[in-house]
UniProtKB/Swiss-Prot annotation:
CDD domains recorded: GrpE (cd00446)
Gene3D superfamilies: 3.90.20.20, Head domain of nucleotide exchange factor GrpE (2.30.22.10)
Chain residue ranges for the region called Disordered: 1-20
Family: Belongs to the GrpE family.
Ranges of biased composition (kind: Basic and acidic residues): 1-17
Localization (cell): Cytoplasm
Signal peptide: none
Name of the molecule in the record: Protein GrpE
Function: Participates actively in the response to hyperosmotic and heat shock by preventing the aggregation of stress-denatured proteins, in association with DnaK and GrpE. It is the nucleotide exchange factor for DnaK and may function as a thermosensor. Unfolded proteins bind initially to DnaJ; upon interaction with the DnaJ-bound protein, DnaK hydrolyzes its bound ATP, resulting in the formation of a stable complex. GrpE releases ADP from DnaK; ATP binding to DnaK triggers the release of the substrate protein, thus completing the reaction cycle.
Gene coding for it: grpE
Amino acid sequence: MSNESIKAEQDLIHEGVESEVSTEEASLIDELTQANFRIEELEQLLADALAKVDEQKDSVIRAAAEVDNIRRRAAMDVEKANKFALEKFANELLPVLDNMERALQGTNPQDETTKAIYEGVELTQKSLLTAVAKFGVKQIDPQGQAFNPDQHQAIGMQPSAEFPTNTVMLVMQKGYELNSRLLRPAMVMVSQGGPSQESASIDIEA
């Protein structure tokens, strides 16, 4: 076989090998391209799924917050309703307590003819005050105390040698508070004469 024939045969073999390699490379590139497309598609699906999860998570958080707000508002409404009902009840009860107070003031406990009435009214009043105290109703009786504009309403002022200046010398009508909140101020007469509180304290200590 001549050299030219051998060379021609080698060229054919080389071309065949290159053709097979090119075909395999093309097939591999095609597979890689499809794989990349599939990866991108899966990544997009994953991103969409994560976005939906975040959206649902936000919805759950918002729903939980709304439920919590509704419960809080409902609790506040119930509390306000209870306070309003209790305050209304206490205000309706004040005239009854005032009438008992006036009955005691107008009855002589030393008089045998009215002693039983006095004791009966006094016992009823104490029982009623004890009962309403369980619901936070407290009587304000500031006799002899310093005048407090937050709890007392001054009807007038009078000179007094017995009481220091700005001291409650007479309680015209007792006040009441509900759970430390003023229901009605005590109606009082205030001293405008006599020794000051400080002077009175010094005199007592002396």
